[in-house]
Amino acid sequence: MEEEFRTIMLNTSAISEVVGNRISFNSATQGAALPYIVLHVIDDQEEHTYQGPDGLSQGRVQVDCYGATYGQAKTLSRHVRGALDGYRGGQFSAIFHASTRDNREGGTNEPERPFTVQLDFLTKWRT
């Protein structure tokens, strides 16, 4: 699931033209140039019938869009939402936008702290 989720964004020109291949899971590559995207699997639950697993899973993926400015992070988040919300294809039967949060990274050097827009997506896919 993770690879295909990332590939959807890499294959969306509005996203890849901004971040290139700087889309990773769990943490950004150290020293990565802004803007970039970090993905987190928040939960992943295999669905069952009384006979056992039914071959479908549902979960939630958090997409963190980082930018040097709020505008850069927000614009990137809009491209991500446009690419993923309502997506159906490949092993995904559905991806839906669930929530958005605007944030700014903590740290001691305020001018260097990136801006972040976090989006949560509910996913349903065939395992």
Task: Give the ranges of each region predicted by the language model.
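Low-complexity, flexible helical/coil segments
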Residues: 58, 71-79, 98-101
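Acidic-leaning, charged glycine-interspersed low-complexity segments
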Residues: 82-127
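Small/polar-rich, solvent-exposed N-terminal microdomains that initiate assembly or binding
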Residues: 1-53, 71, 75, 82, ...
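Solvent-exposed residues in well-ordered beta-strands and their adjoining turns
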Residues: 42, 66-68, 122-126
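A broad, low-specificity signal marking well-ordered, structured residues that form hydrophobic/aromatic
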Residues: 37, 61, 119
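A generic structural micro-feature
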Residues: 31-33, 53-57, 111-116
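Active-site-adjacent structural patch at catalytic or cofactor/ligand-binding sites
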Residues: 58-66
